[in-house]
């Protein structure tokens, strides 16, 4: 983690529970990021917090440290039942819930607080078995949580801490009724610690959220700069006919160590995957049609470096912390301005630099003015030579529905020109 990403505030300087500090230091966390330095003094004093910060700035660790500290410092309610978790962390997607659970495991191991995970798609009985043994902190998506609550597999009457992560997306996806249903089954707002964290918190979201919070304090980091200053942004204007060849040429020239390509529809993602897989790239596909187990496996392979390229719809854009993503390609400019911020926020995380390349084609170029108005700046435009685009490209692969979305290992496919890697970089 780059030192420029951190403050001089140490976790050990706060009155955090010693076991929480130990768990953080075991993972190499000594100094706070700005959002952690702002939020922790408030949560440690029992204040509710709505935190806004760009992606990759440590929001997850801020609410996890607060949650574990609060539960260790405040005894469970006397007479608490096995099916009553003490803390509830809600996320908008299965992938984000799984990631939060993974981030919390090191704290769980040191503190002894038990974790539970609840999300739709699969694993119903496996998740239920963990819940039946009793958990302190339950992390999940609203649909599965309501399912378990209606069947009395969980009871929210002993909740001491509640967290909404990526709160804007929770509301945007229409989960507000689900959230309110869950809140109505918890103790009143003044009897629990409430936290909201997100990269974007509109006034509408804060107004709705504060209905469920107790005089929450609003904290923000770099509120006027919606895109990370370590991210180099670049824009091309291709024709529809040249768009795919431009993408493949840019990938060949940049040769990114790890990149995510976003498109607006699953069919477009499948098309991109087919071209890149045929060209010998190690590429994974992440859309809503991919089975849950396969989605998690693809994310794991991408995180470990077994895949170099991930082609995804916005299902993967929110909240996922995948380290060392060097490039993000917006094959389609998104219809939602906030999605642009979240997409390019996959790179340039934790103090590292990143590169975002967007293609403003004939179909989606009309989305650009709203995006630039929202971010507060124009995206630098680069030109390309149509005659220099790759032409020796194989026919795209057809997606095999019963197979994983991976191409051959990249190092088994010879580079097109055989030129040294450093000589393939574009100038500037």
From Swiss-Prot:
UniProt: ATP binding residues: 53-60
Motif window: DEAD box: 165-168
Reactions that this protein is recorded to catalyse: ATP + H2O = ADP + phosphate + H(+)
Pfam family, one: Helicase_C
Organism superkingdom: Bacteria
InterPro entries (UniProt xref): DEAD/DEAH_box_helicase_dom, DEAD_box_RNA_helicase, Helicase_ATP-bd, Helicase_C-like, P-loop_NTPase, RNA-helicase_DEAD-box_CS, RNA_helicase_ATP-dep_RhlB, RNA_helicase_DEAD_Q_motif
One GO CC term, this protein: cytosol
Helicase C-terminal domain sequence ranges: 245-390
GO terms under biological process: RNA catabolic process
Renumbered residue ranges of the record's region Disordered: 394-428
Gene3D superfamilies: P-loop containing nucleotide triphosphate hydrolases
Chief localization: cytoplasm
Ranges that cross the membrane: none
Helicase ATP-binding domain span: 40-219
One GO MF term attached to the UniProt entry: RNA binding
Role according to the record: DEAD-box RNA helicase involved in RNA degradation. Has RNA-dependent ATPase activity and unwinds double-stranded RNA.
Protein family membership: Belongs to the DEAD box helicase family. RhlB subfamily.
Assembly with partners or alone: Component of the RNA degradosome, which is a multiprotein complex involved in RNA processing and mRNA degradation.
Name of this chain's protein: ATP-dependent RNA helicase RhlB
